[in-house]
Amino acid sequence: MNLNRRSLLKLSAASVAVGSIGLPSFAQQIEELVIAYNVNLPSWDPTVGPSAVNPTIQGLYQSVFDQYILQQPDLSPAPGLLTEWGWSEDKKQVWMTVREGVTWHDGSPFTAEDVAWSLARVAKPETGSPIQFVWGTLANHRVEGKKVIADVAQFDPTIFKWMYFLTGYVLPKVYYEKVGAEGFE
């Protein structure tokens, strides 16, 4: 058989057409979502251990957990779980207003208590947060309505920037206390 250019093009077009005809799918249906990722996830707690500061894993964590403050593509902050934040005039306290109408995975409401607890938890050295030294600059976290107030133990002008960077995630207090750290492994 001698193929000229025109015959080769016709044969190629016919092959593409035959290949595009719908064939039955042999894939099995499953009851779970499977995501392939190029690194292992050692923990589902995005605030502790080496994985908390691994930039490769942050995409996974951001798919599951919300951060205090969001970061826009131009790197500017935007409201996230916190709608407003700032400093007292004397810079001895920070305040944060918590978004309303948010629920956790189990349907329970997201509260200012979750924010205060999450910030206080990662400030403790025993939690294993790799950047505990940042969160430890705030102390005496308390809730006043939908606001969280914290005292500034050591002034860090970048504290709000950390809330949209590594380990800047809020965890559900009630759920965490129910399942413990083991529930996030």
How does the language model describe each region?
Residues 1-15:
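N-terminal secretory signal peptides and thylakoid transit peptides that target proteins
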Residues 30-32, 63, 80-82, 91, ...:
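Extracytoplasmic
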Residues 36-89, 120:
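N-terminal lobe/hinge region of extracytoplasmic solute-binding protein
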Residues 40-43, 101-103, 155-158:
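Solvent-exposed loop/turn segments at secondary-structure junctions
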Residues 132-185:
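Surface-exposed binding/hinge segments that line
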